Amino acid sequence: MKIILSPAKKMITDTDSIAPDGLPEFIEKTTEIQSWLKSKSKEELKTIWKCNDKITEQNFNRLENMDLYHLLTPAVLSYEGIAFQYMAPSVFEDSQFEYVQNHLRILSAFYGVLKPMDGVTPYRLEMQAKVEIGDSKNLYEYWHDMLYRSVIDESRIIINLASKEYSKCIEKYLTPKDKYITISFCEQAGTKLVTKGTYAKMARGEMVRFMAENDIENPDDIKKFDRLGYIFRSDLSSDSKYVFERKIA
């Protein structure tokens, strides 16, 4: 069973805590993307990154000095977004690190697929960015089915905790043999159930922590998740979609 999760824009370098364990699987493809980005002007990169001058400057300098092989941080400790804050890997026990290393895969526009302990350096790139390398019109074409082939294992089970931008990389290549379960976090807004972005990100991270703490190997056990006020809604769920509703006091 594999769990897929989106990356975060905000990243840090931490070479003092835990050493990474190996390099990402597709480091040669990453090198190709790095070269393509370095061939662009600062103004072109600002458009690709869709960010302000300050963030452009920061990431332009990162790109100029980027070393994909040295002073690396384990991926799960490098990302600082909301999901990763609620996963809280910095306080994982050894068994929880082992669980996520075996089961969690972080999808990345720059690295493709990351195991939690893969060594990474901060970058800025989203899967939807206008990047045309070789004959590829975009990054979805560039990565093709590589992410799917990397993630799928002998169990054929994938738990989707990623955003649509990243889960698309997997969904396009699913086969009838695969069991693909999307986890949906929502709450009542008037008469409708809606997904609130921030709460969903919090819940995705908390869900990974819950699965790691409970060493979950069977998708049915995910239904017991009851953190951050969420409860499983069996009446709204199916074999391919587990719906959790946040009960607002």
Where do the model's predicted regions map?
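Short hydrophobic beta-strand segments
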Residues: 2-6, 157-160
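Active-site helix-to-loop segments that bind/position phosphate- or nucleotide-bearing substrates
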Residues: 4-91
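Internal, well-folded beta-alpha domain core
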Residues: 89-239, 243-249
